[in-house]
Amino acid sequence: MSDTTLAKSFEPQTIESQWGPEWEKRGYATPALDPSRPDFSIQLPPPNVTGTLHMGHAFNQTIMDGLVRYHRMLGHNTLWVPGTDHAGIATQIVVERQLDAQGVSRHDLGREKFVERVWEWKERSGSTITGQVRRIGASPDWSREYFTMNDKMSEAVREVFVRLYEQGLIYRGKRLVNWDPVLLTAVSDLEVVSEEENGHLWHIRYPLADGSGHLSVATTRPETMLGDVAVMVHPEDERYRHLVGRHVKLPLCEREIPIIADDYVDREFGTGVVKVTPAHDFNDYQVGLRHALAPIEILTLDAKINDNAPAAYRGLDRFDARKAIVDELDAQGLLESVKPHKLMVPRGDRTGVVIEPMLTDQWFVAMTKPAPQGTFHPGKSITEVSLEVVRRGEIKFVPENWTTTYYQWLENIQDWCISRQLWWGHQIPAWYGENGEIFVARNEEDARAQAAAKGYTGALKRDDDVLDTWFSSALVPFSSLGWPNETPEMKHFLPSSVLVTGFDIIFFWVARMVMMTTHFTGKVPFGTVYVHGLVRDAEGQKMSKSKGNTLDPIDIVDGIGLDALVAKRTTGLMNPKQAATIEKKTRKEFPDGIPAFGTDALRFTMASMATLGRNVNFDLARCEGYRNFCNKLWNATRFVLMNCEGHDCGFDKPEVCGAGDCGPGGYLDFSPADRWIVSLMQRVEADIAKGFADYRFDNIANAIYKFVWDEYCDWYLELAKVQIQNGTPEQQRATRRTLLRVLETVLRLAHPIIPFITEALWQKVAPLAGRYPAGKAEGEASLMVQAYPVAEPKKLDEACEQWAAELKAVVDACRNLRGEMNLSPATKVPLLAAGDAAQLQAFAPYVQALARLSEVRVLPDEAALDADAHGAPIAIVGGNKLVLKVEIDVAAERERLSKEIARLEGEIVKCNAKLGNEAFVAKAPPAVVAQEQKRLAEFQSTLTKLGAQLARLPA
């Protein structure tokens, strides 16, 4: 073999395009179901089927894939289940927009044809995101990939719905929901974005019914007064206590409504009197229930005023009605004042339209109703059980503080609205008779049988609504494993080991998976929830299209030109006026576009930033640093191969050194340097194992980086060169063996984080290191399924670690002396040394090579060294004195030092004057003052050194 077997430079795309498909083809991700091995499994949070990969996905999947590869290499039965979500609203909107561009609405097509179009779109674009997941190096078991609307998943959804209905835990009722008047559907809280906006606070006079005066009512939404059923004051508000129980006339409507008292009122807000509109406000709805006030709806589903309002406003859009109502109140002298007011406005995240609380007929899951007999937890509600399993420690959150958030959400829970007025999704399995009869069944045939059993023989019409996307997502922990059937996968992989997720969906997804899984299987869905932060830009800003700061992970992997990047960031903006600003910012930030960093560099960056619970401020400069790391690892491997291929690397004898085999005169003569790097590797292996156990990927990445770059490459390779050049055959053999074995171990250690480069290098290193599976030709085996390194405490060698620390200190001291004396790297000079003669003699060949010296001369004592030093700088390291012997022009050196000392003294005077100025210290930012103090300390330190050098110069 020659060194040409490894390409001269690291080309990530070549390796990724080879090994990604190869791993998948070989089926390494399909688990053995070996009862003697531990099980490890993870669910991939299913991304939207027609979506594209974003930085949050890349981060999340780096963590998951790292865990999966680690446990697979530990020999566990390892399953990572991939899948995609049908994403009801998101997908329907995309297809509706395509139709809009053709001048066609979904209603023109009809439901059946429209759903066909969505399926066509899913088939065309659905592989985009799974292709991108593959590009990030993710290694789930693709043979088990699911789509939340495929036949098996749909069967599970219907089964759950029917069983919950039969158990009395699903019901249909009229409740207040978030309503999007453009999409004409209920939406979940997660699809509502509330941001502070500038609005107004109107003070309106409501005349007392007996004509004795009026109450001034404060509101931010005057149009909803048409649906007022009461006005409300705080029961302890002395200003209004005497009016409770009386009535006011509702302006413009001329009906009388009561004055009620409720603790909900904030006495400090406005006038302390507020209107009660149960049909169009969530808080008012609860007030209405407490006081038995019937709600009055005044809006149509598309947010126009309906026939319950006075004729003058019927048919008006809600905001046009607001203006007309305010104008009429003003004309009647009932508008007391209008004041600017900041308020939180809820908008649909898909449409940007103001969301309207709306009373509609919907399907709900009962959150607090006790489950009946025959279930896993009779007498307890699904919420109660979900709280209990976390309190008992069956599920733990990492970091632990998210447990509190989970409790708070569940302790204040409302019944879950699960119906959506869409066409794309799981159609609700309910059929209606002509007189309002409801038959919930697994299919229409069962529904007809139910109807017949109850004596109904008329027509049946299926419910048009579909289920909330989160309903099917909540079943994934068991539906993806084959439920309702009992499968081997259910036995091995439920509960899964860990869920890796962002904090934003703890309630919407995490809590609901706990509810559904405990209710239908009696088990928790996962043992641990690892909650990570969100990926933000380098300044800590949220990444968003409107800010123009989004990054596509695939662009970081493959690179993208500036013009293409600008086009990507400026097309499809909600507000096209932002395009110019975004273009300017992008051209400034990426003048040459984004270079190709490769998947491994991106993954290493993500892992290095994965501190517990904190948001990740993604910085491309870090990515460049980890690409440089990959290059360093590649070049180190080339060096090792060049120095080991074709040589005796010490693998002709058994692994374990027998008596006399490993030492002077033995088959292998390991040096202290060899033993040091092996000892240090045990510590790194232990640190990495702890990092995986604690989900501290930042610690894992840092341990790998520091060991490879700082210890193996910067120190051990340089020491190994000396040993190969100067050593005996036994020493050379031991060094080559150590070079290979440590490198091969490093490749296995780093594989879960940087899978592609480690696989490519392992193919070359493992055969030489005696670690390639027997009987396999190069390329036939894979690093992906090799054993993960485990620390061996017996290989720790503190004496050799101390030896290395002392050697490094001597080398560093020599390098510092070179710097002090302004020696160019090409200039080789002798080192004079005195002190521990035996140690200095042992260090000599290493120090000579690493500090670029012509020789190392060990003198008998310090007196001899001082006599030979001729005033040159002396370094003291432990009990050793070191000096570089450089012939210098004493007069010229004295002049140079004197000039530099004078300059430094001048700088010190300036610094002292600045720091002695009270105004500067008081007004300057602390960082500026600290910087000045640091400069002063550096000047003083250098002055002391130069003074000592000057004093040592001969007269």
Swiss-Prot record:
Membrane-crossing residue ranges in chain numbering: none
Residues given in the record as ATP binding sites: 545
Motif mapping: 'HIGH' region: 47-57
Pfam families attached to this UniProt entry: Anticodon_1, tRNA-synt_1, Val_tRNA-synt_C
Localization of this protein: Cytoplasm
GO MF annotation: an example: aminoacyl-tRNA deacylase activity
Domain characteristics, as noted in the entry: ValRS has two distinct active sites: one for aminoacylation and one for editing. The misactivated threonine is translocated from the active site to the editing site.
Stored PANTHER family: VALINE--TRNA LIGASE, CHLOROPLASTIC_MITOCHONDRIAL 2 (PTHR11946:SF93), VALYL-TRNA SYNTHETASES (PTHR11946)
Name of the protein described by the UniProt record: Valine--tRNA ligase
Organism for this UniProt entry: Burkholderia pseudomallei (strain K96243)
Gene: valS
